[in-house]
Amino acid sequence: MQEFTNPFPIGSSSLIHCMTNEISCEMLANGILALGCKPVMADDPREVLDFTKQSQALFINLGHLSAEKEKAIRIAASYAAQVCLPMVVDAVGVTASSIRKSLVRDLLDYRPTVLKGNMSEIRSLVGLKHHGVGVDASAKDQETEDLLQVLKDWCQTYHGMSFLVTGPKDLVVSKNQVAVLGNGCAELDWITGTGDLVGALTAVFLSQGKTGFEASCLAVSYLNIAAEKIVVQGMGLEEFRYQVLNQLSLLRRDENWLDTIKGEVYE
């Protein structure tokens, strides 16, 4: 798509601080390395500030929350807001947990660059009817007409923030633009951690100076296109998971990968 510029080669090996869960941390670390940056995962309140100060972007994922981790998240987010460090917040599980929803709404005061979630999570967060269960989106929540206007209003309230809403069609919404993106394959939903990986890749592109809108579009499209290249080969899920990381490192060598992004951008 002509709207975006190729982020590769990565200009500097940025340090990406991921506050994520134990299930997906290895995939995120390897995905960040595959793009040419460096990961760090620190969620102890006693040291989290030290690592955040050294980082070029912060990714907060609520996939495995505890009281101690919440304390660390608040410390890191507060610092990020003070120094304008690019920050991605992944609102995992807000459909099921009032604690998580309350935390995400508090984090909005720190003006994250990108707020990410699946369709049910984002509908729940902004006060729309939803049918999500646990951390999964519902097929009943894929209607976007009512959601888009609410998200635009939120972007006006939280100036500078973009929404990344994942689903069969991925939505990226900023104050002035909307992208509806169509790459991807069903197999990505069959292995754990791929949604978390999108958030981490968004942080990578933010560390390279991309806006929240562009970083979100690039991240979700990059992973989806990598997966499309694999699924045509036909393989089991464990091999598919391995090849996702493999393709992430290979796709960046393709100078024309942006041409394979499916979707539209609207002003």
Curated annotation (Swiss-Prot):
What's its catalytic activity? Answer: 5-(2-hydroxyethyl)-4-methylthiazole + ATP = 4-methyl-5-(2-phosphooxyethyl)-thiazole + ADP + H(+)
MF annotations from Gene Ontology: ATP binding; hydroxyethylthiazole kinase activity; magnesium ion binding
EC number(s) per UniProt? 2.7.1.50
- Which CDD domains does this one have? THZ_kinase (cd01170)
Task: Quote the record's binding site residues for ATP.
Answer: K116, T166
Q: Which cofactors are reported in the record for this sequence? A: Mg(2+)
- Write out the residues that bind substrate: M41, G193
Give the top-level enzyme category.
transferase
Keyword line: ATP-binding, Kinase, Magnesium, Metal-binding, Nucleotide-binding, Thiamine biosynthesis, Transferase
Pathway linked to the protein: Cofactor biosynthesis; thiamine diphosphate biosynthesis; 4-methyl-5-(2-phosphoethyl)-thiazole from 5-(2-hydroxyethyl)-4-methylthiazole: step 1/1
Regions that span the bilayer: none
For whether the record's keyword set contains Ligase, the answer is no
Q: Does the keyword Magnesium apply?
A: yes
**Known SUPFAM superfamilies for this protein?**
Ribokinase-like
Give the UniProt record's GO annotations in the biological process aspect: thiamine biosynthetic process; thiamine diphosphate biosynthetic process
Q: Which family does it belong to?
A: Belongs to the Thz kinase family.
Its function, per the record, reads: Catalyzes the phosphorylation of the hydroxyl group of 4-methyl-5-beta-hydroxyethylthiazole (THZ).
Provide the protein name: Hydroxyethylthiazole kinase 2
